[in-house]
Amino acid sequence: MTAPTLTDLIYLKKNYLSEEQCKTIIDEYQKSMCVEDRENCFHAFTGLNTTSTYTVKTCQQDSKSFNIIHQTVGNIINEYHDYLDTFDAFHVSRRASMLYPHKYRLMKYSKGAWIHPHVDDDGAGINGSCTINLNSEYEGGTFAFWGGKHKVKLGRGDVMIWPADYSFWVHEVEEITEGTRYSANCFLCDKPKFDYTQDVKYDVKGSDVAIGY
């Protein structure tokens, strides 16, 4: 068997959520009274702190959308580890590395919106990223890794998970040229973050193994 490549570590599950489930999550964004925020982080290639043009709201704990997203991400994490096992190449302790969400971000990319090349790891326990694409009524908005050298076109209900090791997993969302893209995203952590209560945790098979790097 050949050695796994970087692109092998990106796991995509097509049509995982139904149209109805996707609509439920979009509806929370549209009806939520939460502040519609913008985010900023360092541009991977210039090092400049850059504000992106999409808007974001935090999914409210115990809402219908929250439960859909939480169950989906937990299932995908388990599938991802089972998939990685097929390479017979990775440390078993990785199963204890993605047990908690940072938070569930509901994201809206209107026409002209994008997110610049960046990484998700903050140096404090973010080990993976997961995104759920919620609609397909838009043009542009392609998910791109490594300056566009690897691109993934996501459809409604698609779920994608990948590692978030600092500096290597540079990714972006290209500009929306028509329509509006909705997505849900979360960072996957080995310890609880501040956004949700500590009982918000994934039931990951084999996660009782000690982490040892």
PLM region spans:
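Fe(II)/2-oxoglutarate oxygenase catalytic core
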Residues: 1-159, 167-213
